[in-house]
Amino acid sequence: MAAATSIPEALDHVGYLGRFQIIFMILYVGSAVIHGSITFQFQALSIMPKVICLSQRCKTLQENESKDTLICHLDVDEWKFDNSHFNWLTEFQLYCDNTYLKGMGTTVYFVGFMAGVSLLSSLCDKFGRRKSNISLLLGFLFATIGLHHSTSLKMVYFFRFFLGFFHSGLSVCLFTAFCEFTQPNVGAFANVLCGTAFTVGGSVSSLLAYHNRYWQDSLPPLILFQAAILLIYFVLCPETPFWLLARNRNSDAIESINFVARINRNSPLPKDYQLLHCQEEKEAGNPFRIIISNVTLRDAIMRLSFAWFTVSTCFYALQFNAGAVGDDEYSVMIWMGFLDVPARLSILYFAFRYGRKCSARWYFTVCAVSLGLCLIPSVTEMYLGTMTFKSIFVMVGHGCGGGIFSLLYTYTSEVLPTLARSTGVSMCSTVARIASILSPFVIILNQISGSLIYFISLACILTSMSLMKSIPETLNQPLPNTVAECEVLFHGKSKVESV
């Protein structure tokens, strides 16, 4: 009988970056472009056309009780509206007294995102990655079709909520599934590429919204096509070997790895191959209890959750505050997205070379310096070409936030056990969505003080840097499969032998 070995060693044998993983990565990264377009679709369409001119309120005529006809001439301003700039605000008349509804499209989406990431991601740990992804993709398709055929504002908000609801669970489950079919560094690479694709999708949304009034009609078919391809892929693919082994389904885990071997055109595992059994977790049926009942994991999730909240504040608040930096709102949104690309790709290099923890600290520092400079009027009012320095500093801070966002997905998953990995990431993401929900209303902070959003972001960054000091480095470390292995990662205790 062959000696028992671990899943990473088995994936080494069948190929951890072969055809199977490359196809998965292409679908995973490609979906992020669509998701980025969906997330920022309403923002790109929520810029009020500047050609709308409203008249002053008409003067009320005095009541005329006589039967004589009175001819009156009132001089009022002309009401003029130009339909050449079409967006969802003009379609549902969300201007004048209805302006407060402008941010609701994005807020409802993020409320759904928070609800979904709280309720759905734990299903991924409980019922498996494959079944969860199939169910979430079906729900995602339903919400997309419903949104495309909405005929009222209530229907738009309803389906926008469920689009965020299913998108949130899908994003976490897709990421978890991919990481468990390959090595951690490959998972980190794919996640950063996914984040880059997400921002490119958001920038393309802004660009298309600026040039084409009917661009949003072409988005649903792309979403349906991408979701259908992913759905077929997961129907054909097996469950991840990590999840199967955590459930002590050794033979199924070996069969899953052999499926990867066939797609990668490598030799399968020997018939007498054995995987190391995991210690059965006491709370295996409840992923939340695995985290809450362990002091180490609970403390780590609390610290990482605040880091997620901080990054979400910097990323989305600055994105939705694009019109307050003094330049054209469309231009700032587009540049923000495209400048995120080098920021996210560069953090990939630093994360592989110097580690996750060190890279996060460096990017937090650059973000803090950029936002701190936004508080100096004499500097921010200077121009570089046609853009103010304030716009440049905001874009740098936004880019660093996007880079850390990609890194935190990977970093968080690498410190959690298999049966609580998806749940732990979702708990952190839930906290981040609180900032996302509030982000569209940063205009209220601008009415109090234009610098308040930068003060808040700066304070959050400094606090996060302090809290993350106790999180261990995970570079070149295998994914922990049990709570005991997490304890080793955090405290260096003697490793519990598998039985």
Each model region followed by its residue ranges:
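C-terminal transmembrane helical hairpin of 12-TM major facilitator-type secondary transporters
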Residues: 358-408
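Glycine-rich segments within core transmembrane alpha-helices of 12-TM secondary carriers
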Residues: 31-39, 112-113, 167-173, 182-234, ...
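Non-transmembrane, juxtamembrane loop and terminal tail segments
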Residues: 1-12, 237, 244-292, 424, ...
